[in-house]
Amino acid sequence: GIRIDSKVVYRGWAIPQSIYIDYDVLASCHPALNWSGIGDILCFHTGVLDWRYAEREGKIEEKWRYDEGLAQQSLRKVRGIVENIDNIRVMNDQGIEALVDGLKWGTSYHGAGWCPRHIEGTDHFLFYTLEKLTGKKFLHGQPVGLGVIVGSMLHEDGAEEMLDTISSIGLDIRPEAMGLTWDQLAEGLKLLRSYVNKVGLWHSIAHDVKISDGFITDLQNRLNHAYHHKKS
């Protein structure tokens, strides 16, 4: 994926012959850098929800027709993160393996038959909107993880479990952890619908739903409760 005029598009074709993973190097990294990796796996949850939504609405792209087999495989990778919260938090070998297994299926999308449709939806679209709005550079998993919660809330599917997983692992997705104010996030959330339609990102629930002040208040309450609970 590369950015062209602020829009992420998929270009190129290459098959890696071998990939070397040094567990000791990964285990020695700052925890937040590793924890950030869960964003690009948990996004399969909202990516699949948006893929199914676009199919139901008759707005799916011809190039990325819905594939239930790929969707189910992607959701199994999400379960791999949910079931390894403790291992990922301490970054032991099992935790690293859970991350590697999920990331090789999605981020390196050659593992999914060259189809990136399950990889991103509302989750990444919020990230792109905030990036465009603020000009900031983010630790990837933070805005994506926040987008997973926003997308799950919009779909009314799995938001509590996703937030518990993210906060229990230790990744802080509150706006203040990314150098944003709540006012900036609120502006980004309200801009999301117009931005994704203007840029022409593939169809998601974010294209159709207007985010209200009540939704933003609910999101803030959920985040504050999740992280206060983890610290108490």
Language model regions located:
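Solvent-exposed, flexible loop/coil residues
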Residues: 3-6, 13-17, 142, 150, ...
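Active-site segments that bind and position negatively charged phosphate/pyrophosphate groups
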Residues: 65-170, 176, 180
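A glycine/threonine-rich phosphate-anchoring loop and its flanking beta-alpha core
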Residues: 1-74
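Short, charge-rich amphipathic segments
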Residues: 3-13, 52-61, 79-96, 121, ...
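C-terminal charged capping/lid subdomain of soluble metabolic enzymes
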Residues: 41-46, 50, 54, 60-61, ...
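A short hydrophobic/aromatic micro-motif that marks alpha-helical segments and, especially, helix-coil
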Residues: 37, 138-139, 196-197
